[in-house]
Design a protein with these regions (language model features):
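Hydrophobic, helix-rich cores of sensory/ligand-binding and other regulatory modules
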Residues: 360-363
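Nucleotide/phosphate-binding sheet-loop regions of phosphoryl- and nucleotidyl-transfer enzymes
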Residues: 1-350, 354, 365-377, 381-389, ...
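N-terminal glycine-rich flavin-associated loop
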Residues: 357
Length: 410
């Protein structure tokens, strides 16, 4: 459930910001749509006893994955978080939501993801806990409060009013159209700067609610193989929210047994085996979109709050990016083979590549000038939208985290 702020708001944003009657009209329309959303969900925006939290994300006519801001868990504050903890009996879940909101909020104010990663890494090291899902509720509360202090120490005011948060989130998403990374992406992809973006405002659903909840992305067709056979392929993870998967920040698990076998994944967990109802419902929806409605192959982002089909939610869908095949001489077969296997991972585009490892844009430029024929492979722990220039300049990408449905991969 949700509503759309159209591109007309983007085009008229200066008038809305500067002309009081236009601003009041816009606020009134947002309030009206919030009331309808409250009726549809049975929750109340800003009510600590039964809060409606929102996701606020861009929606341009041509997808620009990860280039513009997304704010999740909007409408949250300390009082509401305490209310969620009391209502659900799950303090970890409540404080994880607030932690995520604060990180999105800080990054929308130009703070670095690395700053927040350093905070949670320090907690993990000090407590001897390798994964955040193993924190207690009180420990997650301390992490969230540390995030808030980090933001305030950076000179950024944390707004507690849910409605003011929503208005700020809308402004930030609109402004992110002009961000350097979004402009760079549009130049690379040949997208006009004049189109602007709409905004999708949706009720939050929670893949981080429990170990039986999760989130993921599926392709309706194998992205590596030609043909139009409908076969689900993609990534999912449990006890996380959607941005974790598409941002490439977590290690993911395969959708099907067939995918697990083909990719030689070192996990026994697949969506098909561990969440069969979710898998079958996704398959049913894929057949409905492709076979019944004649859509092109789709990339579908989903979240499930439990193991039954009724717990599944579709967050968004878009046409799959179809990659062109290209023959590349990857290896010199006259050279002796490598003595031992150094590691293996998940291939995204199929085939193979060899080349020189690089780590920065300056390094890429230097090797392009020195050896223009040498293929360059960018190495990252994970990828974030600000890496778009490096990714575009390199020939290949190797990351320690993330899956084939992350923004960098697609």
């Amino acid at each position: 459930s949700g509503f759309i702020v159209t591109t007309e708001v983007f085009r008229c944003r200066e008038v809305i910001e500067s002309y009081a009657p236009a601003q009041r009209n816009f606020h009134d329309q947002i309030t009206q749509h919030l009331r309808r959303l409250e009726q549809a969900t049975g929750k109340a925006f800003g009510d600590p006893a039964n809060p409606l939290l929102l996701s606020v994300r861009s929606g341009a006519s041509i997808s620009q994955p990860g280039m513009m801001d997304t704010l999740l868990d909007v409408g949250n504050n300390l009082e509401i978080t305490a209310g969620v903890a009391a209502r659900t009996g799950n303090a970890w879940f409540a404080w994880d939501n607030y932690r995520r909101f604060l990180q999105n909020y800080g990054m929308a104010h130009d703070m670095s993801r690395d700053d927040f990663d350093a905070v949670i890494a320090e907690f993990k090291n000090r407590l001897g806990i390798p994964l955040k899902r193993h924190f207690s509720g009180d420990q997650m509360r301390e992490v969230a409060l540390a995030y808030r202090r980090l933001i305030e120490e950076a000179g950024v005011e944390v707004i507690d009013s849910p409605f003011e948060q929503l208005l700020l989130a809308i402004r930030r998403v609109l402004a992110s159209w002009e961000s350097p990374r979004a402009q760079a992406y549009r130049r690379i992809m040949g997208i006009s700067d004049d189109w602007g973006t709409a905004i999708a405002i949706q009720a939050m659903v929670y893949g981080n609610r429990s170990p039986q909840a999760g989130t993921g992305v599926i392709f309706t067709h194998n992205p590596r193989w030609a043909g139009d056979v409908l076969k689900l392929w993609g990534d999912f993870t449990t006890a996380n929210q959607g941005e974790d998967v598409v941002s490439g920040l977590v290690n993911t698990m395969p959708i099907s047994l067939f995918q697990q076998e083909i990719e030689m994944r070192e996990t026994d967990v697949t969506l098909e085996t561990h969440f069969p109802e979710i898998y079958q419902e996704l398959k049913r929806w894929a057949h409905t979109l492709i076979d019944d409605h004649g859509w092109s192959p789709q990339e579908i982002e989903f979240t499930f709050e439990g193991a039954s089909a009724a717990d599944l939610y579709m967050l968004q869908t878009r046409d799959m990016a179809i990659r062109e095949s290209q023959k590349v001489l990857a290896f010199d077969f006259e050279e002796p083979p490598i003595a031992r296997l150094l590691g293996h991972g998940i291939g995204v585009s199929g085939g193979a590549m060899s080349g020189r490892l690089v780590f920065t844009l300056d390094e890429i430029k230097a090797w392009r000038a020195r050896e223009p024929e040498t293929r360059l492979i960018l190495v990252r722990t994970d990828t974030v939208p600000d890496d778009i220039r490096e990714i575009n300049a390199a020939d290949g990408l190797l990351t320690a985290r993330g899956g084939l449905t992350s923004h960098a991969a697609v």
